[in-house]
Swiss-Prot record:
Region annotated Disordered, chain positions: 1-28
Sites where the protein binds ATP: 258-265, 321-330
InterPro entries given in the database record: AAA+_ATPase, GAF, GAF-like_dom_sf, HTH_Fis, Nif-specific_regulatory_prot, P-loop_NTPase, Sigma_54_int, Sigma_54_int_dom_ATP-bd_1
Location of the DNA-binding region in this protein: 554-573
This protein's GO CC annotations: protein-DNA complex
Gene assigned in the entry: nifA
Function: Required for activation of most nif operons, which are directly involved in nitrogen fixation.
Protein name from the UniProt record: Nif-specific regulatory protein
Domain GAF: 46-188
Transcription regulation keyword on record: yes
GO BP term (any one): nitrogen fixation
The species this protein was found in: Bradyrhizobium diazoefficiens (strain JCM 10833 / BCRC 13528 / IAM 13628 / NBRC 14792 / USDA 110)
Length: 582
C-alpha cells in the first residue's frame, strides 16, 4: 500500500533550497538539500513518515512529478512503499501502483536506471507506462537508483518527470539521488537494528516473566512467608503463596475469601509484612463483633463528649493504621447504612471522627475478609454493589484444608510443638495418629485441626498420640453436622449462589442429616457405637456450631442454617442453649 503523508505528518516548515533553473544544476542547492534530508532522517519518527518527508523535500530541489521509495524484505516481497507527488484525491488505482518491471530490474542488477522516454524503452511494461502517464505524445523521463544496506539492495528510490534539458541533467540527478539513497540506506539499517533489539527485548521479557511464574516466588520470600506462620507445601497453598508475594508489592485493596478457619488473618498479616508498609502498623477489626454504633466509633474514632461515655477523644482504627494496613474481618456483616460510610473512606481516604466536622486524611491499605457469599448478598440488596467492587480489587480465595491434605502432617506437628512448648510436654505423633488426621474432612479447617490436636494432647496420658486417643475413635466427635450443613462442604464462598426462597425453609428436625462420622472410609469407632444420640442431639449441635461460628450473632447463624432469626431464637430456647456474651 502506497503511503501518502497527510498534512499532519508533513514537516511544519522546511527550508526550501534555491532551485536551479532547468539545465543548470546548482551544487549549492544540492548540498543544502542533502543536508536538510539528513536532518529529517536523523530525527526520531516512524520510518514511513520520515521517508515521505524526504520525498517531499526532494521535490524542492530536484525536478520531479512523482517520487517513490520502495522497500523489500529478505524474501524480496514489497514491505513498504512511500510516495510523493500524488494528491490525496488522486485515483486510488494510480496511487497504489508502481512501475514494477523497472523497479525489479534495478533491484536485480543493483544499478541505476535512467530513461529519457519510458514509452520507447522495453524495461517498462505497458502497465508501467500507464502508471507514469507516458504516451507517444507525452514523453516521461525516469530515474531510479538502488537503496543498499551494507552491500545488499533493500529497495529503490525513483522519480519521474516531463523531460526538460539535456541528458546530462539526468546523469546529474541520478548521482544526486544515489547520494540520497545512500543516506536513506543508513537510516533503514538503524531502524531495523532498533526494531530487532526491541523485538529481542520483548522476547527476553516474556521468557523471564514465564520463568518467574514457573519458579514461583523466590526462596527468600517463601521462607519469609513460612516465618509469618503459613505452613505447608501443597500445590493449593503454593499457588496462594505466589499470589501473596505478587499482591504484597502493590497497595491495592485485597479481599480474602474462604471458609472459616482457613487463616484469613494470617494471610492478611503476611501480605502486610511482605510489603513496603511492613514497618508501619497492622491494625485489625472484626466487623461482626460490634454493633453499628460502636463500629463507627471504632473505625473512625470520636471526640470528647460525642456520646455518653466519651470522656476523651479517641483515634479510630483508620487513624491508627495510617501509612500501614487495616484488616477488616467479616466485612460482609456490616449494615447497608454503614457500608455507605465505609465506601467513602475507601474511595477518598478521608473521614470525620464521630462528633467532629474536621476531615482527616489517611494513607491506609485495606485488606478485607469474609466467608460470606457477597455476590448473593449484592443480588439480595444486602450488600452495596459499589462497595463490593471497591473492596474486591484483588480477590484471593483461601483453599480449605480438605484441598491441601498433604499439609495436614506439617500443621499437626507444628501445633503439637506449640502445645509442648506451652505446657512443658514432649508428646509425639504416631503414624496411626497421622492416618486418623488424614482421613478427616475438618469442616472447621486449620482452626479445627489445631483444636483437635490441643484437645487430644491435653487428654493424652502417654508419651505419644495414637489412633485411639482421638475423639472420633471414641464416638465423641460431633463435627458431622457441621460438614453436612449447607454452609460447609456444599458452599463455595467465591462462587455466586442462588437466593433461598422463604418457602424452602424447613424446621430443624426435618433438615437434620443422618448421623455419621466426619472421617472418610475406614470406621474409627468400635462396632455398634452410636456417634450422635438421635435427631434432637444433632439439631442442638447444629445450632451450637452455627452460633459459635457466627460469634453468637443470631442473624448470622440464621443465614448459615437457612432459617430465619426468629426460628433460631426458638431453637435456642427449645434446647436450652445459653447465649454467650462477649
Amino acid at each position: 500500500m502506497l503511503h501518502i503523508p497527510s498534512s499532519s505528518e508533513r514537516p511544519a516548515s522546511q527550508p526550501e533550497p534555491e532551485r536551479a533553473p532547468p539545465g543548470e544544476p546548482s551544487h549549492e542547492s544540492a548540498l543544502a538539500g542533502i543536508y536538510e534530508i539528513s536532518k529529517i532522517l536523523n530525527a526520531p519518527g516512524r520510518l514511513e513518515v520520515t521517508l515521505a518527508n524526504v520525498l517531499g523535500l526532494l521535490q524542492s530541489f530536484v525536478q520531479m512529478r512523482h517520487g517513490l521509495v520502495s522497500l523489500f524484505n529478505d524474501d524480496g516481497v514489497p514491505e513498504l512503499t512511500v510516495g510523493a507527488g500524488w494528491s490525496e484525491g488522486t485515483d486510488e488505482r494510480y496511487r497504489t501502483c508502481v512501475p514494477q518491471k523497472a523497479i525489479h530490474e534495478i533491484v536485480a542488477t543493483g544499478r541505476s536506471l535512467m530513461v529519457e522516454n519510458v514509452a520507447a524503452e522495453t524495461a517498462f511494461s505497458a502497465a508501467d507506462r500507464e502508471v507514469l502517464g507516458a504516451s507517444d505524445s507525452i514523453p516521461v523521463a525516469f530515474i531510479g537508483v538502488p537503496i543498499r544496506v551494507d552491500s545488499t539492495v533493500v529497495g529503490t528510490l525513483t522519480i519521474d518527470r516531463i523531460p526538460e534539458g539535456s541528458s546530462s541533467l539526468l546523469e546529474y540527478d541520478a548521482r544526486l539521488l544515489a547520494m540520497v539513497a545512500n543516506v536513506i540506506g543508513q537510516t533503514i539499517k538503524l531502524h531495523r537494528l532498533f526494531a530487532g533489539d526491541r523485538e529481542q527485548s520483548l522476547v527476553d521479557k516474556d521468557r523471564l516473566e514465564k520463568q518467574t511464574v514457573d519458579r514461583g516466588p523466590p526462596a527468600r520470600e517463601r521462607k519469609q512467608l513460612q516465618a509469618h506462620g503459613i505452613i505447608g507445601d501443597s500445590p493449593a497453598l503454593s499457588a496462594l503463596l505466589e499470589k501473596i508475594v505478587v499482591v504484597a508489592r502493590s497497595n491495592s485493596t485485597v479481599l480474602l475469601r474462604g471458609e472459616s478457619g482457613t487463616g484469613k488473618e494470617l494471610v492478611a498479616k503476611a501480605i502486610h509484612e511482605s510489603s513496603v508498609r511492613a514497618k508501619r502498623p497492622f491494625v485489625k477489626l472484626n466487623c461482626a463483633a460490634l454493633p453499628e454504633t460502636v463500629l463507627e466509633s471504632e473505625l473512625f474514632g470520636h471526640e470528647k463528649g460525642a456520646f455518653t461515655g466519651a470522656v476523651s477523644a479517641r483515634k479510630g482504627r483508620f487513624e491508627l493504621a495510617d501509612k500501614g494496613t487495616l484488616f477488616l474481618d467479616e466485612i460482609g456483616e456490616i449494615s447497608p447504612p454503614f457500608q455507605a460510610k465505609l465506601l467513602r473512606v475507601l474511595q477518598e481516604q478521608e473521614f470525620e471522627r464521630v462528633g467532629s466536622n474536621h476531615t482527616i486524611k489517611v494513607d491506609v491499605r485495606v485488606i478485607a475478609a469474609t466467608n460470606r457469599n457477597l455476590e448473593e448478598a449484592v443480588a439480595r440488596s444486602e450488600f452495596r454493589a459499589d462497595l463490593y467492587y471497591r473492596i474486591s480489587v484483588v480477590p484471593l480465595l483461601l483453599p480449605p484444608l480438605r484441598e491441601r491434605r498433604s499439609d495436614i502432617p506439617l500443621l499437626a506437628r507444628e501445633f503439637l510443638r506449640k502445645f509442648n512448648s506451652e505446657n512443658g510436654r514432649s508428646l509425639t505423633l504416631e503414624a496411626s495418629a497421622i492416618d486418623v488426621l488424614m482421613s478427616c474432612k475438618f469442616p472447621g479447617n486449620v482452626r479445627e485441626l489445631e483444636n483437635c490436636i490441643e484437645r487430644t494432647a491435653t487428654l493424652s496420658a502417654g508419651t505419644s498420640i495414637v489412633r485411639s486417643d482421638f475423639a472420633c475413635s471414641q464416638g465423641q466427635c460431633l463435627s458431622t453436622t457441621l460438614w453436612k450443613s449447607t454452609s460447609y462442604g456444599k458452599t463455595d464462598p467465591a462462587a455466586p449462589m442462588q437466593p433461598v426462597p422463604a418457602k424452602s425453609i424447613i424446621p430443624l428436625a426435618e433438615t437434620a442429616p443422618p448421623p455419621q462420622a466426619v472421617c472418610e472410609p475406614g470406621s474409627l469407632a468400635p462396632s455398634g457405637t452410636v456417634l450422635v444420640s438421635g435427631a434432637r442431639m444433632a439439631d442442638r449441635e447444629r445450632v451450637v456450631a452455627a452460633m459459635e461460628k457466627s460469634g453468637w450473632v443470631q442473624a448470622k447463624a440464621a443465614r448459615l442454617l437457612g432459617l430465619t432469626p426468629r426460628q433460631v431464637g426458638y431453637a435456642l430456647r427449645k434446647y436450652g442453649i445459653e447465649i454467650k456474651r462477649f
